[in-house]
Amino acid sequence: MVGRGASLCAVQPAVAECGPARETPPLEVSPRKRLPAGLDQDPCSSRPAPEGAGASAEQSHSAGGGGWCRHCHTKLVELKRQAWKLVSGPGTPLRDPCLSTLLLDKLPASGVQPACRPDTESRCDVCTTHLHQLTREALRLLQTPASHEDPNASRGGLAAPSSRDPPGPVGLMGRQPPVGPDRRKATAWPPGPSVQVSVAPAGLGGALSTVTIQAQQCLEGVWSLSRVNSFLPPTCLAEAAVAAVAVADTVRDCAPAAGPERMSKAWGRGAACTTALVTPAPGTSAGGSTGPSAAASFFIRAAQKLSLASKRKKHHPPPAPSTRGTSTYPTDFSGSLQLWPPPVPPCLLRAASKAKENPSSFGKVKVMLRIWPAQGVQRSAESTSFLKVDSRKKQVTLYDPAAGPPGCAGLRHAPTAPVPKMFAFDAIFPQDSEQAEVCSGTVADVLQSVVSGADGCIFSFGHMSLGKSYTMIGKDSSPQSLGIVPCAISWLFRLIDERKERLGTRFSIRVSAVEVCGHDQSLRDLLAEVASGSLQDTQSPGVYLREDPVCGTQLQNQNELRAPTAEKAAFYLDAALAARSTSRAGCGEEARRSSHMLFTLHVYQYRVEKCGQGGMSGGRSRLHLIDLGSCDAAVGRGGEASGGPLCLSLSALGSVILALVNGAKHVPYRDHRLTMLLRESLATTNCRTTMIAHISDSPAHHAETLSTVQLAARIHRLRRKKGKHASSSSGGESSCEEGRARRPPHLRPFHPRAVVLDPDRSAPGLSGDPDYSSSSEQSCDTVIYVGPGGMALSDRELTDNEGPPDFVPIIPALSRRRPSEGPRDADHFRCSTFAELQERLECIDGSEAFPGPQGGSDGAQASPARGGRKPSLPEATPSRKAVAPTVVTSCPRGSPGHDTHRSASDPSKTGTQSEQRVDGSRPEPPASDKTSGGGGRRPLPSPAPPPPRQPEAQGIPKEPGGEGTDSVLRTPPVGMSGQAALPPLLSDSAYLSPSARGRHLERGLLTTTVTLQQPVELNGEDELVFTVVEELPLGGLAGATRPSSLASMSSDCSLQALASGSRPVSIISSINDEFDAYTSQMSEGPGDPGEFPEGTAWAGGSPASSIGSWLSDVGVCLSESRGPTPQPPFSPNSAAGPGPPEFPTPGSSLEESKVRSSECGRPDNPGSARSLHPGEAVATTQTQPGREPWARSPHEVASAQTIHSSLPRKPRTTSTASRARPSRGPYSPGGLFEDPWLLRAEDCDTRQIASTGRAPSPTPGSPRLPETQMMLACAQRVVDGCEVASRMSRRPEAVARIPPLRRGATTLGVTTPAASCGDAPAEAVVHSGSLKTTSGSKKSVSPKGAFFPRPSGAGPPAPPVRKSSLEQSTALTPTQALGLTRAGAPSAFRGEEEARPSGRSDSSVPKATSSLKARAGKMDVPYRPSGHMSLERCEGLAHGSSKVRDVVGRPPRAVPRLGVPSASPPLGPAPACRNSPAKGVGATKPPAGGAKGRNLGPSTSRALGAPVKPLGPVAGKTAGGAVPGPRAAPRAVPGIGAKAGRGTIMGTKQAFRAAHSRVHELAASGSPSRGGLSWGSTDSDSGNDSGVNLAEERQPSSPALPSPYSKVTAPRRPQRYSSGHGSDNSSVLSGELPPAMGRTALFYHSGGSSGYESMIRDSEATGSASSAPDSMSESGTASLGARSRSLKSPKKRATGLQRRRLIPAPLPDAAALGRKPSLPGQWVDLPPPLAGSLKEPFEIKVYEIDDVERLQRHRLPLRENEAKPSQDAEKGPVCISSKLRLAERRQQRLQEVQAKRDHLCEELAETQGRLMVEPGRWLEQFEVDPELEPESAEYLVALEQATAALEQCVNLCKAHVMMVTCFDIGVAATTAVPGPQEVDV
């Protein structure tokens, strides 16, 4: 055994250390030196008993006349050891006579040891044994057949040789690894890698205790070269080796009795066997027992200590084969990994510390070359005659076999020998390389990448019989023979364990195995049998490859089985290998050649954020291990035609791989399934790919070798291009996509691009680098599993109780794009522009979550499955589904929604898709809105869409989501697409399905009129800008009922659905709209049922806690808006504003007026102006007048505002954003949470809108709206990633051209308002509101906020300017300014959120948040912070309150900023404000940049990031600054001067906050409570984190009463990286992600959260993940900040952000605002597209049916309750006023609901007439219990429920009519009618 060790040492000189004396040569060291003499002697004496063996030994030794002395035994051992060392290599035949001669010559001389000093030089003075005799014995032992015997024989027992050996002592039974030859086989590790010391305790006859010392590997040097095999440090390795050698030597040395024979036999057999220590039984030898036992115990202890010191679990010696459990399959890798897992290469663990590698390395494919030795022992000169390897240079030189090596005088040397060819690779494994060496050198870096969130791929390539399968699979006989796959499995789990301990990250590993085999390219799921538990044919019919235009090939429906342990994963490997065609009996060579196995390990990881609110970050990455067949039909190169047209030759396969790796546009044999499979695995630039090319060293295969080497060298030289698939999720997305099809849709993630967690990938993902977004991000889809209560579901709950669901997008905003899941797949990729495609790609995964999975109308069920939030069915589903539904809302993926989203560029598509989308994606949200009842003003048709959304959630209509159904639903029309089918489901399921819910929200948010704007160039992707004129009375619904966010989650869904349903959803114009819609979805739903349902309801319902929080935020915002300080200004502002004044007047209280302003203002001026606006305005107004007070009072006012705001400017978009946000909220870990954000955002937005709508409505309205629109677009885009950018970019133009755009396009409300002069203000208000809604919504959906803050990075800067601007605005119109501030801020928030481009919205919101934050300690941040207050909420509700007010003040500024045409001051000053604020913004932005570090200030940072926003807010705030009152003014001043505000309030925090400003602002945007922006609550992202807190706290009436997520949310900024399965992120997600999710956070989180590493990356990128202090604010802010950063760092956010920023148009406004500096280029770029998008708006009426009942039911209570808290939070003393307000709101709501009911009755009658149904039918079903007191809340709730039910009925009828006649119902815009108004398109 020692000999073996020696040989190993020979193989590995380093092992010499293991010699007896490290300092002296082994031969010179005597065993005594190694061990204390005592030990030596003791062992010797202890062996007397075994001496019986001694006799045998003696006999065997013919040389020794008598027994050899102990010294001679020692000498023998040493000689054997030296002989082994002298053996050249594993392949050297030991029996070679030459070797024997050489050894005889060398051993004696070097073997003379002082210890054995012979009498004479050659004899021992003790026993006179001749040294040569010992030498010959040593050689005999080396060469003895035993050495070649089956290791098991020796393993059977070394004592066996000697019958005399006592059985007990024969503890020699140490397991013997395969003998020399086996070990020598470079490819295998010795079966017994560890030195096993079997000790028979002195007292035990046969009892053996075994100690495994990982020394065999040390001794043998199996891992010597790389030392990767051992976890032990070199010193430990050396010690272990020494100990093992010492033990072995001692054993042999001490067993003279055993004698040479026994030892020789044992030794011979164990040439490579492990060391065995034989301890005689105590009785065996007198006095000898103590020595051996002591020695044995010493070594055992030493070994144990070494093992422990290595800090690695002690690897118990693999039991004898008999002890291993029998495997059901031919192979037993599972048992192997369990018994003797391969040692983890140190380089792997070291790499683990380096979380990531240089991103640049990702573009490169590592190519390694393995030289397979020719069979037989002919690895002689012949093999080296044409192949020379330089391992040091990693080069291989090929000579012409005829010429021979250069310096060789080969017989065939030709005079004109061809020039040798040299090739360099990343690594070369010569013929004698150990399998372990190959595995460690190949797998380590790939595993690191996978664990970090990127995809990884390792595949073998080469001709037949070159060990490809051996390399990949290996053998299960020993750790040294394990192949790459089992090693990767073992090490992956080891790495995961290490990461779990280090980072607390949770992982879930899933395994899938697919095979492409035969000439027919049959695709087989190798785990189908295991998965089904049946013996069904593995020809799993479910597995298929789908070509995805955007994401490339997607492998669908393969089984992914959860593997909690490496053994389980290995078990699946065994099963896959058994199921593989090559394992079948009679499998021929041809079958083997054409068998290609793809074994994939899907790594889902998520980390619960510190906040402990379920906030999680994480994602999915995949490790593809591909065992490629040789493909060639013949042993040679094989012709391509040999196997038929479908058969690829190896050269063809090489060309395919080269093309895929190179990102070539054209891939040969693209239709071949193997090509498709490889594309799915390799074509992602973010995929860490390693190719192991196999060549033969036989000259006979020179041609094959040369061709393989040439191909490998080409691949090695080329660097991965940022392939088209990068953004198309070739890898990640593909993985997502593949998951999409094969996983239940509900488990599908939204586009992972936004969720890359790995910092390296994060940047790319966020930055818009297609490459990065493709693999890592995509593969690392953010997976957030949200439980019913908004609680994050663990993978266990979602899956098999152990792992997270495949994945769910953590970013609802992105998810919103996923809404269209049905037709979406096809439509979704129908893009006229690449940007569009990219956008689709981004949401593909999420949107991919088909309602189907949810299948039922119950989004919840799908959502639960997907979101894992089943419990809160509506909420959970929405939450989970929110991802998809949100996407749906945003852009029904399957349906044109997504397309619309993208088809904006495509006019025809835009029209149709937009329409579809409107009806599919948007309509659904509007329907939801309608259903909410909050949007009573919205025509029933509007509600109809919600049902579609629900179907989407259900998966049936799933208008947006359900591609097929959705299509149909959408087809019915924009106006009423999903209403019919969805209504029922919508109410519940709609919420359930985030997508549905998003839609509902969107619907709720969107007004009837959907302007399908088709700014084609936003992001290069068509963006349908839909303006939903009709605005949901979100406030009304949301206000009362949804205070308790979590509790309401379920209802929230309903509310949301209702809210969404109540209002027709217009497909978000372009991405922005979509984004807004998405955001709005959250916000929208509440909007209609009184924006509150969606927003509030959402906040309350979706994320119950969130809702509370959100409401609080909203409340804060409302309070701010309505708040004492803000109220008056608001009222005046309202008055001042053309539209706002009008509404303000109707609104009893400031808040009411705010709501009015937002709701009415939005519709009134902008709303009216817009086709929908008149009606919408009417609806909104009607709702507003009645509903507004109601909405307002319940804090739904904010919601309403948000909705109105959203509708007017980009209400739809904004609304959508708002709604989307709620959707997101649900989507969030706690759908409730997200919802709350949405709600919050909406609330905030609503307020802001009210405020903006009112105050800024006049002057800032127009300009602001555009900006808002721009912002919104930007935000939306950001949320979507690509889409967001696109939307934004369009939005910017839209913003710039908002007035024209206002036509009802993107900014539904805004557009119209822009149209009219009054509308300009109104629009400003509406737009602002819209923006706010959007912004709020989006902000609320942290992404938006996050995104905006980024765009609104200027936002924070704006605050400083804002001071001046605000003051300016104030000077211009205190009231108006206040209105602007309030309305404007909301507007800005929304707008900003809606379109980053209209930075002001974001600024407003962010600023508001910032203000709130400023209150907390930052003025600039207030604006954003208002939304972000949630984030900063912990900082202080009071702060939030004042901040909110300030935000209210700020909003005007935001409005100006947003208010491209802000009020006159905003307009004139808007630019001025924008400029001034821009400066501030610019200044602030720097802080934002600086604040990045301080993610807490992300809001501010975001604001900074969104200078435009700040400018808007500045204008708004400036105007509102004075008006806002103490809060607004003071805050306005500090807040207004983004810098100043920051400097003032943030003075100390300025830098820090500035850095976080962006994040914060984003968060702020997300948190309506911060500012008077509804969306502030929307900031639920922050909301939960911060926004929710603020809004919720405020809403609750006491800042201290934030939603459950309020505080938690703040800390859970990691949510930003809640990407992967940070399914627990559900809660956090809702909290923080929403703001970021809205637009920014989502994208932001996306980018930051998609990879596991991306978590870290994202954190780094945003600076939020890292900031623990600001974690609360940072959570949302981080995302915001990250987003800002993203904006700042095009590289980081280039892909997502930039794309989203395609909304630069808003930036222009932003630029004007001063935000431009932050996101100048990017954002600026975006504007033109936005403008383009907005240029050609369509008004598409989308009717979304939602569960009005539910919406109303929940919204109302939320509104009332939330309104109260909101007021209280806002006013503080507002507690009383809050009650009054509540009553007022209730009254308003009652009026609105009644008006809506009347309107619905009329519509029902009309619809019945159309359907030829007897009039009056069903009406009795919707009557309210006459016994109820009309003034009571119960009556209102009952009325709302009845109205919701009626609305659903009407929607269903309308949908039916539309489906049958495709007619759009034009509803006369009656301001008195609370229901959403529809404008005929």
From Swiss-Prot:
Composition-biased stretches (Polar residues): 905-915, 1366-1378, 1400-1412, 1616-1629
Residues engaged in binding ATP: G462, H463, M464, S465, L466, G467, K468, S469
Gene Ontology MF annotations: ATP binding; microtubule binding
Chain segments annotated as coiled-coil in the UniProt record: 1780-1812
SMART domains: KISc
Record field: compositional bias (Basic and acidic residues): 818-827, 1151-1162, 1390-1399
Modified residues (Phosphoserine): S30, S1257, S1654
Biased composition annotated in UniProt, kind: Basic residues: 742-751, 1685-1698
Tissue and organ distribution: Expressed in several neuronal populations.
Alphabetized Gene3D superfamilies for the sequence: Kinesin motor domain (3.40.850.10)
Disruption outcome: Mice exhibit growth retardation, become emaciated, and die within 5 weeks of birth. The median and mean life span is 15 and 16 days. Macroscopic dissection reveal that mice suffered from megacolon, with dilation from the distal small intestine to the proximal colon and display enteric nerve hyperplasia. Severe occlusion are observed in the distal colon, because the colon motility is not coordinated. Defects are due to abnormal enteric nervous system (ENS) proliferation.
Region annotation Disordered: where it falls in the sequence: 20-66, 145-193, 309-330, 718-778, 794-827, 846-982, 1078-1104, 1118-1266, 1328-1425, 1442-1633, 1652-1698
Tree of life domain: Eukaryota
Bias kind Pro residues: ranges: 940-950
CDD domains hit by this protein: KISc
Subunit (UniProt): Interacts with GRB2 (via SH2 domain).
Family: Belongs to the TRAFAC class myosin-kinesin ATPase superfamily. Kinesin family. KIF26 subfamily.
Name under which the protein is recorded: Kinesin-like protein KIF26A
Species annotation: Mus musculus (Mouse)
Organismal lineage: Eukaryota, Metazoa, Chordata, Craniata, Vertebrata
